[in-house]
Amino acid sequence: MDQLYLEIEISTQNAETTIYTSVSSFLALYTYRYLNEPKNIQVNFVATKIESGKIALRSSQLRRELTDQHITCREAAKLPAIRDLRLPIYEKDGNTFIAGTCAVCRELIARQPNTELRKLLGFKESCLLAPSEASIWTRFCEVDVVDVVSRLHEGLLLKAVPDEVVRFEQHMNEPVRMHNIYKQAREQANQTENGAKIKRKHRVQIDGRTPKEQLLIEHRFAEGISFTIADLILYPLLRIVFQHCGQMLPHFPLTSTWFSEIDSFDGTCAKILGDLYVPQAASQGEELLSIPDCDATSLYKADPKRYKPRNRIYTSQAEVDLALAKLSELQLVFSTDSEHTYGQQTIDWQKIEPTHAKSSALPQERLERKRQQLENMANAVVSLAQPGDRIVDFCSGTGHLAILLALKLPLCTIIVMENKSFSLAQAQKRALELELSNCVFYQCNIDYFVGRFDIGASLHACGTATDIVLQQCRRSVAHFVCCPCCYGSLQPMPHISYPLSQRFQRVLSTNDYLYIAHTADQAHEMGTTNCKPETTLQGLQCMSIVDTDRKLQSEEAGYQVILTRLKPEQCTPKNHLLVGRFVKQN
């Protein structure tokens, strides 16, 4: 039986007990109730101290679930995943654990045999499939609106309607984006009022040359004309937000219509919210709130209106030269030359992957280069590892590095972490074929991992992901082995700012740093098409600069760091390797 772990906090005052939960766990519980409490899923509650805004639950509605055998204390939990991941967590197949609001709610639905329920996952079951780092829409549902509700339950007093409400109203005013929209438009145009089809000779013709904006298809639900998991998540969140907004709902007619559509389509959405949620005492008066101005862009990534060239950073050679000149003040040598190498070839790939060379879609030469990259990474990790270590392969993909480490380090626990379900399933399949028992699989974003570990590894984690991995290693005082990638994709985040090291921060601004990072992506293999030697040499220099900054930041945190290159160097243009061993607490 699958397991669902939800976060609760038990508070007793004046002999009265109140059960609180986090917003994310509330959404998972809400989805579980909407699915009519499926028999193949057991709900478990994890007692902890909820850090952000907490929601009071109607405990009378949870008598069956809130029993001693289904409540555990997080610190005393026997299951490591409960301590490793942010709740809620979905466990399936005994060794796979899923974290993240949308991913957990999707899995609750996907594991149901009822095909009608699985239609909630949308076309090709892809609704909210992309992780929040890659999808503006997933981020809106999983992070932005959740954060608003959380802050409201921390006591936030509104002076204006939250931006997220305005953005959703604008989203509902955008043209519908859906698969086969022209077919849907033809069917809609050729139906009578009672739903019958119009005779062939009177049919309206609509072809692909008609602009989508002119198709008479309007948002009935959040993603178009079908009720999906996006509606299931947003409905309770926005209902709660409007409870804190006084009399503002009439000022958002499309959102109001959307609420009415859902209430008439399936009244259980409102009923479940009423059954589970204890409304806060009204803290907002009857006065009207102001409505903020927000850019009228859709919540989908591929929106031409979002492309604003003035807001993008373009790199001119003059700006690069100026940034490099500022760095000269530090009098540092930016080099990846090192006496330390990890390119020893000790792996019998035929034994590990007897049929992979034949079945792989990769050409033989590229397959060989990939194996060389993996061998360098594995050798570096082995040089740091001790029996009993917990080793995390961040951004693991289909698990090639993790599985190699599991084979080379049978006394260590290997955590395979990847946010794409399909890739993780491939990794599980290979681990099963090799009968590995020391692998655990976590489907989640890097930020959802909060556990302790001894070594962190990442092979070509894209852009800022490498810096998030390094940040995780510093948090856990863990050694690290990182081969960075996509330098030009570096972007500041709320918890990551550039430059990274104190020494770089003294001479470079964020824009200076990003000019250098963009230039680092010009490092191509010498002799390839369109490769200018002077441009490539400058790109290699900028790669060394960015990774030197990473090295300095780690050294400031008490690490001894080796910056070297993979061997042979031709195995990948992005061949830098950072190997860090924690030596002292500053």
Curated annotation (Swiss-Prot):
Q: Enumerate the Gene3D superfamilies for this protein.
A: Vaccinia Virus protein VP39 (3.40.50.150)
Where do the GST C-terminal domain residues begin and end? 121-276
* Database matches in Pfam families: Methyltransf_32
- CDD domains, per the entry: AdoMet_MTases, GST_C_family
Disulfide-linked positions: none
Q: Which GO terms describe its cellular component?
A: cytoplasm
Question: Which PANTHER family does this chain map to?
Answer: GLUTATHIONE S-TRANSFERASE C-TERMINAL DOMAIN-CONTAINING PROTEIN, PTHR13369
**Family, similarity comment:** Belongs to the GSTCD family.
- Kindly provide the name given to this protein in its UniProt entry: Glutathione S-transferase C-terminal domain-containing protein homolog
Q: Write down the species.
A: Drosophila pseudoobscura pseudoobscura (Fruit fly)
> Which lineage ranks, top first, belong to the organism behind this chain?
Eukaryota, Metazoa, Ecdysozoa, Arthropoda, Hexapoda
